[in-house]
């Protein structure tokens, strides 16, 4: 889905890692929340509170999922899922434009 309709957007940005990662929360009419974000170059560790689907819209990133020992490269159009209450690592060499969907 390249477009969300009939949504509310929380204006205040979620800013992490000294401004190298930022996102905005989008609330769909169904009550579902998503974040649209952007990452600058760096290595980051994220903790999840609920299941997430991370979709890369543009750019590239390397992901180290929980329990894995090898990084996996993702390109634009690819996604991965992460369970609730885990940590995962992200390495960005150029930039990453992403959409995070939260699921139960």
UniProtKB/Swiss-Prot annotation:
One of its GO terms (cellular component) is cytosol. It is an enzyme of class 2 (transferase). SUPFAM superfamilies: RmlC-like cupins. Its EC number is 2.4.2.1, 2.4.2.2. Keywords: Glycosyltransferase, Transferase. HAMAP family: Nucleos_phosphorylase_PpnP. Catalyzes the phosphorolysis of diverse nucleosides, yielding D-ribose 1-phosphate and the respective free bases. Can use uridine, adenosine, guanosine, cytidine, thymidine, inosine and xanthosine as substrates. Also catalyzes the reverse reactions. Belongs to the nucleoside phosphorylase PpnP family. This is Pyrimidine/purine nucleoside phosphorylase.
């Amino acid at each position: 889905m390249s477009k969300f309709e009939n949504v509310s957007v929380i204006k205040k940005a979620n800013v992490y890692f000294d401004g190298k990662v930022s996102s905005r929360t989008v609330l769909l009419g169904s009550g579902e929340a998503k974040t649209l974000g952007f990452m600058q170059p760096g290595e980051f560790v994220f903790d999840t509170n609920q299941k997430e689907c991370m979709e890369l819209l543009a750019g590239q990133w390397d992901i180290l999922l929980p329990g894995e020992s090898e990084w996996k490269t993702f390109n634009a159009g690819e996604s991965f899922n992460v369970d609730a209450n885990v940590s995962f690592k992200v390495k960005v060499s150029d930039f990453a434009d992403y959409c995070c969907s939260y699921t139960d």
